[in-house]
Amino acid sequence: MGAAGVLIGQGFDAHRFAPAGSGRELWIAGLYWPVPDSCSEADAARYEGIEGDSDGDVAAHALIDALLAAARLGDIGSLFGVGADAHGAGRHGIDMLQEVVAHLASNGYTPASASVAIIGNRPKIGTRRAEAEAALSAAVGCPVSVTATTTDHMGFTGRGEGIAAIANALVEKI
């Protein structure tokens, strides 16, 4: 551990978009992304949700892994399980983040700072960046910055098949 008792962790998550008509809601960075009123029926499919056991919120999930990694407490799968019957099944990323913060506290750690980079063509994160930062910061209890990028049409995110996120987090021993 560093002299100041600050530890860093990194997390990553990626999910495929659900097929059109699946009824899955699109949740990213703790926010629901509804189909815009001005959206054509053909474009509405681009707001289909993300496949996953929970809400598929890649930003929240990457942040969970970063926080747990920093405290050396495992990862999202070790805390919430995997599969339809797991502890995390059907849950929202924000709820899971709040549980992780409580788990950190019970193990003597507190979040100090975090950053999440969302990788994908859609939705356009910049339009709601401040809202996303506020939602994640409130859930974690420390400042969380949110950035977004594309892969210039390369790979599964570039082809619009899915979305990914990378997060870094600092935790302090309390």
From Swiss-Prot:
4-CDP-2-C-methyl-D-erythritol 2-phosphate binds at D13, A14, H15, D75, I76, G77, T149, T150, T151, D152, F156, R159. Its EC number is 4.6.1.12. A divalent metal cation binds at D13, H15, H61. It catalyses: 4-CDP-2-C-methyl-D-erythritol 2-phosphate = 2-C-methyl-D-erythritol 2,4-cyclic diphosphate + CMP. This is 2-C-methyl-D-erythritol 2,4-cyclodiphosphate synthase. Coiled coil: none annotated. One of its GO terms (biological process) is isopentenyl diphosphate biosynthetic process, methylerythritol 4-phosphate pathway. Its cofactor is a divalent metal cation. It holds the Pfam family YgbB. Keywords: Isoprene biosynthesis, Lyase, Metal-binding. The record marks D53, T150 as: Transition state stabilizer. GO terms for molecular function: 2-C-methyl-D-erythritol 2,4-cyclodiphosphate synthase activity; metal ion binding. It comes from Bifidobacterium longum subsp. infantis (strain ATCC 15697 / DSM 20088 / JCM 1222 / NCTC 11817 / S12). Involved in the biosynthesis of isopentenyl diphosphate (IPP) and dimethylallyl diphosphate (DMAPP), two major building blocks of isoprenoid compounds. Catalyzes the conversion of 4-diphosphocytidyl-2-C-methyl-D-erythritol 2-phosphate (CDP-ME2P) to 2-C-methyl-D-erythritol 2,4-cyclodiphosphate (ME-CPP) with a corresponding release of cytidine 5-monophosphate (CMP). Binds 1 divalent metal cation per subunit. Belongs to the IspF family. Pathway: Isoprenoid biosynthesis; isopentenyl diphosphate biosynthesis via DXP pathway; isopentenyl diphosphate from 1-deoxy-D-xylulose 5-phosphate: step 4/6. Homotrimer.
